Regions:
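Active-site core segment of subtilase-fold serine proteases
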Residues: 44-46, 54-83, 88-280, 284-306, ...
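Loop/turn elements at helix/coil->beta-strand transitions in domains of secreted/extracellular proteins
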Residues: 101-105, 274-279, 321-327, 355-361, ...
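Secretory targeting and sorting signals
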Residues: 1-41
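Solvent-exposed loop/turn segments at secondary-structure junctions
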Residues: 110-114, 127-129, 154-155, 284-288, ...
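Cleaved targeting-peptide boundary
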Residues: 38-50
Length: 519
């Protein structure tokens, strides 16, 4: 996004007059007038390509192909210590001016699982499975993002209300077992013989008390005590293996009355804007794919990206029409600059949401670990006429590259240094935020997590621009709540002008600097 200021030659409406050409397939130099190799121009907008806002749903029937992601907690974690990024952003001071009350933030992601610490969660629809409401998170990603934006604090004193949570779904690729027929035979008749009680012993009159048992033997060696539950119990670990957990306190044979309900243990975690409402829209999932094999002419991976671009465009329009004044898109798509697919609908959608509906759209810069997300050049001092290196772009990230309407966020560490091997640079990066030391709400229970299940019974530490975008979305919500009279354009302008700038003033890794909620 270009830096907004007095005298700028760019405005949000300046690109909306003509139909896009750059968004049509750019494969193999097919676009007339496009410089050779990887050189591209900023995208243009065709408002007439706006997709309709119908009931959310996938473009084709889908099915679950993989098991849902499990989550965990890293050894030695102390959630009573505030995450480093919260200290870096000085949120306690920022909250003196408000906590985002009254602002709706749409999270277009993998869905958000209900949690007691997300009390204002609104179902926004599902573009992965027909009939869904957006409140299922198989990938354990959208819930993390939403909680970093909006999780309420827990002081441990007041019990949080329980919330319904759907069971974790399983893949539908396995053949169901054949039906079984069970034949029930009648129970054969039984003969019961009643034996009369023996007569009383001689010398004992009828009705006299029966002699008691003999006294116990004298004290001596005692037999082993009865096992009341001590020992060990086998429980599943995060990746489906087994581990042994010791049980130190055996069950009490005489339990007392239950203790009054208590809240969760106090911790230092909170979302950036705990007063906001979250609209959850599930637009993507790595665990789901087409129900029927793809039979078109395009490469299946290209066809999948085309569908993802279309559903993302529809999700943005739907979020804007639901009243979201901030739209967070952490799950972005990368593609080669030599093969940019048609994005007219997506361009029209971000223009509609930002200009017509006055929503602040925040998107991640993209992570190098994702498919097709190869790093872009940072800056070429030999090209002073191209300070943001548009002519050197090798990877396009969408919708992030619609820089006139989308605030794109790069990732830094807790010291403010760019995550250069992870965060995808680009001329559209406008701001940055911490992307490490991630803590969030669990999509599987009422607790906190800071890890996800990895291979070979390992835990993976989440990090990257997805969570940097969540932080900036939270800060944007704080500013919207404090200054409701400001437009989305003015909110973005304020955020990039108050960011902590890099040495050059702006660069393709961190944009105009690290977001500052109290500036």
């Amino acid at each position: 996004m270009q830096r907004f200021g007095t005298g700028s030659s760019r405005s949000w409406c300046g690109r909306a007059g003509t139909a896009t050409i750059a968004a049509v397939l750019l494969a193999s130099g097919a676009l007339t007038g496009l410089p050779p190799a990887y050189a591209i121009s900023p995208p243009t907008i065709d408002p007439g390509a706006l997709p309709p806002d119908g009931p959310p749903g996938p473009l084709a029937p889908m099915k679950q192909n993989a098991y849902c992601t499990e989550v965990g907690v890293l050894p030695g974690t102390d959630f009573q210590l505030q995450p480093k990024y919260m200290e870096m952003l000085n949120l306690n001071e920022a909250w003196q001016f408000g906590r985002g009350d009254g602002v709706k933030v749409a999270v277009i992601d993998t869905g958000v699982t209900p949690h007691p610490r997300l009390p204002r969660l609104i179902p926004g629809g599902d573009y992965v499975m027909a009939g869904g409401d957006g409140l299922s998170d198989c990938d354990a990603h959208g819930t993390l993002v939403a909680s970093m934006i909006a999780a309420v604090p827990a002081n441990g004193a007041v019990p949080l209300p329980s919330v319904p949570r759907r069971p974790v779904t399983i893949p539908t690729t396995e053949t169901p077992p054949p039906p079984q027929t069970v034949t029930l035979s009648p129970v054969p008749p039984q003969t019961v013989t009643v034996i009369p009680a023996p007569p009383p012993e001689e010398g004992v009159p009828p009705g006299a008390p029966v002699p008691g048992p003999e006294p116990p033997p004298a004290p001596g060696p005692q037999p082993p005590a009865v096992d009341r539950g001590g020992g060990t119990v086998t429980v599943p670990s995060y990746s489906g293996g087994r581990k042994i957990a010791p049980i130190d306190n055996p069950r009490n044979p005489h339990p007392s009355a239950p203790s009054p309900a208590l809240g969760p243990p106090p911790d230092a975690f909170s979302g950036i804007a705990p007063g906001v409402e979250i609209i959850s829209i599930r637009q993507s999932s790595q665990a789901f794919g087409l129900k029927d094999p793809y039979t078109g002419d395009e490469d299946p991976q290209t066809a999948q990206k085309i569908d993802n671009v279309e559903t993302m465009a529809r999700a943005i329009v739907h979020a804007a029409n639901m009243g979201a004044s901030v739209i967070n898109i952490s799950d972005v798509m990368c593609m080669s600059a030599r093969n940019v697919i048609d994005q007219r609908a997506l361009g029209a959608a971000v223009h509609y949401a930002a200009v017509d509906k006055d929503a602040v759209i925040v998107a991640a810069a993209g992570d190098g670990s994702k498919k097709d997300c190869k790093q872009n050049p940072i800056f070429d001092p030999l090209q002073p006429d191209d300070p943001r290196a548009w002519n050197a772009v090798t990877t396009v990230v969408t919708p992030s590259w619609f820089h006139d309407y989308v605030l794109t966020v790069g990732a830094v560490d807790a010291n403010g240094q760019p995550l250069s091997k992870m965060s995808i640079a680009g001329p559209w990066v406008s701001i940055s935020a911490p992307g490490t030391d991630v803590v969030g709400l669990s999509p599987r229970d009422d607790g906190l997590i800071n890890a996800i299940d990895g291979p070979d019974n390992s835990l993976l530490v989440p990090a990257g621009t997805s969570f940097s975008a969540a932080i900036v979305s939270g800060v944007a919500a704080l500013v919207r709540a404090k200054f409701p009279e400001l437009s989305a354009y003015q909110i973005i302008n304020r955020l990039i002008h108050t960011a902590r700038p890099p040495a050059r003033g702006v660069d393709n890794q961190v944009g105009y600097g690290v977001v500052d909620p109290v500036a």
